[in-house]
Amino acid sequence: MASDVRMKFDLGFSAQAIRDQMRNPALIEASEKSRGALEVSVRDLHSDDERHEYEITVVSYGRGIKGENRSKKETSVTTVKWDLGTNTRRWTWSGAHPVDLTGEDVLTDSGSGSTLAMSAHINVRIPVVGRVVAKKLKEGFEDNWPKYTKLVEEFAAKEA
């Protein structure tokens, strides 16, 4: 079962200021831990004036159709590729479940701030219950993205 989710946010800081915070390991860790991560590590793969690539490894409690399972832990890896010239972030998630998650986020300057357009593609490779899982994942993005953008703005305000 495949599904897409898209949202736009108007932010009170420049695209560069927001991008700098979205790449900040402290923000990445805070964001992941706000969603229940037990351990978070960020490893740079490549960084120059044109692009920045890194992996985010997260250890969290297991998840199933009924929710969190504290008797087991799961590891997931998100590979992030920034095109710094276009302020575009592309990411791919891989984990313990038959789920493919990819996304693209684009920052543009607008007025005295910026706009962040976020999108994710969800593909659940589970027969029968895949539709339910995809719906829960989509709802998770819709619930968490506003919280994430608020956190990014809080981090940007500390730097201003």
Task: For the regions a language model picked out, list residue spans one by one.
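Short, highly charged C-terminal tails/helix-capping segments
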Residues: 150-160
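Beta-strand/loop substructures that line and gate deep hydrophobic ligand-binding cavities in soluble
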Residues: 81, 90-139
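Hydrophobic ligand-binding cavity/cleft-lining segments
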Residues: 1-60
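Amphipathic hydrophobic-ligand
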Residues: 34-37, 69-76, 97-104, 137-138
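Acidic, low-complexity intrinsically disordered segments
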Residues: 141-151
